Amino acid sequence: MSHSILLPDRALLAISGDERFSFLNTLLSADVSQEVGDARFAALLTPQGKLLADVLCLTEPDRVLVEYPADSEFAKRLRMYKLRAAVALDLLEDWQVTVSFDDTPTAATVRFADPRDSRLGFRIYSPAADSAADTDRTPYDAARLEAVIPARPP
């Protein structure tokens, strides 16, 4: 499969600033301070442990890209927790999340292997105008189910 599949239910947020790692590490279920180019799966939980959002965090040289459920209040919650932290939160509203099972490098803006399971292919973050992605996510959902990766209910 050489095409990409659009995941319209996912959104992107860029977090930059000197305290970006400590800010995220106090809120998320996993340590996201890793090497540039590494991705990590994490979750935002309530104090009681209820799942609010599942996220993928990708470390770039000067920011962390966070992929989260588009219909969640993840970005709003992060703004609420920001207070005096030396971080900037930027919604990447003109970007899209796609997935590809082709390991051939592309001209995509950001591309990395899904850290949860190799069967889930490669995540691609790019400006929405740069892609003609397929909207049939059946192949992705089949791979997700085969890898026993749950999906959020609609």
Residue ranges with predicted function:
Residues 1-154:
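Basic, glycine/lysine-rich polyanion-binding surfaces/domains
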